[in-house]
Swiss-Prot record:
Organism placement in taxonomy: Bacteria, Bacillati, Actinomycetota, Actinomycetes, Mycobacteriales
NCBIfam families membership: ATP_synt_epsi, PRK13442.1
Gene: atpC
Family according to the record: Belongs to the ATPase epsilon chain family.
Protein name: ATP synthase epsilon chain
Location, primary (coarse class): membrane
Top-rank lineage group of the source organism: Bacteria
Length: 121
């Protein structure tokens, strides 16, 4: 099966780089699924995005992403994010508290984290 080269980078660190069979996320114009040989595009991610990376024979990666951009070429997907964290790094109770914040940016980050751990859709 053809694969995508995926790189997810936050301001403070490289989050993940590797091969994937499918990538799903949300942009400002809607949800998007990327398969190998996708048409090239650049899109802005929503502030409460969750990125799901499907890999051949391995568990899916779920990553909470706070804003950023998605760049797609025929073989490569690059995500540049303000911040990002794996679902395994997320404290669900802290994410729930953040999601209820009056600050829209903090609330968006909390929702992204809850999506990554599978607590909300």
């Amino acid at each position: 099966m053809a694969e995508l080269n995926v790189e997810i980078v936050a301001v403070d660190r490289k989050i993940w780089s590797g091969e994937a069979t499918f990538l799903f996320t949300r942009t400002t114009v809607g949800e998007i699924g990327i398969l190998p040989r996708h048409i090239p595009l650049v899109a802005q991610l929503v502030d409460d995005a969750m990125v799901r990376v499907e890999r051949e024979g391995e568990d899916d990666l779920r990553i909470a992403v706070d804003g950023g951009f998605l760049s797609v070429t025929e073989e490569t997907v690059t995500i540049l994010a303000e911040s990002a964290e794996f679902s395994s790094e997320i404290d669900e109770s802290a994410a729930r508290e953040a999601a209820e914040s009056d600050d829209p940016r903090v609330a968006a980050r909390g929702r992204a984290r809850l999506r990554a751990v599978g607590a909300i859709d």
